From Swiss-Prot:
Part of the 50S ribosomal subunit. Contacts protein L29, and trigger factor when it is bound to the ribosome. It comes from Prochlorococcus marinus (strain MIT 9301). The gene is rplW. One of its GO terms (biological process) is translation. NCBIfam families: PRK05738.2-4, PRK05738.3-1, PRK05738.3-2, PRK05738.3-4. The lineage of its organism: Bacteria, Bacillati, Cyanobacteriota, Cyanophyceae, Synechococcales. This is Large ribosomal subunit protein uL23.
Length: 100
């Protein structure tokens, strides 16, 4: 059983993921964010709706295993990363890039 993640909604969303795949998903009104690894889908949905004033249709999450990193003979682990793909309602938009 997982522990509940009790925090402010602003702490759930870390940053947007800007890759080629995530940029192509913008055409389908899907936005990709890096979120806290303890956050659940309802918390992610509530955070996106509160921070950006949009209507969220669906949330898909990816929680890959931590990657190991080696420096010389010392081995360590990178921080846990969880990604959320958020699908917005028709007509809603999130401004990720500044217009110039």
């Amino acid at each position: 059983m997982s522990k509940l993640f009790n925090s402010r909604l602003a702490d759930v969303i870390r940053k947007p993921v800007i890759t080629e795949k995530a940029t192509n998903a913008l055409d389908f009104n899907q936005y990709t964010f890096e979120v806290d690894h303890r956050a659940a889908k309802p918390q992610i949905k509530a955070a996106i709706e509160a921070l950006f004033s949009v209507k969220v249709i669906g949330v898909n999450t990816m929680n890959p295993p931590r990657r190991t990193r080696r420096v010389g003979k010392f081995s360590g682990k990178r921080s846990q990363v969880k990604k959320a793909i958020v699908r917005l309602a028709e007509g809603d938009k999130i401004q990720l890039f500044p217009e110039s």
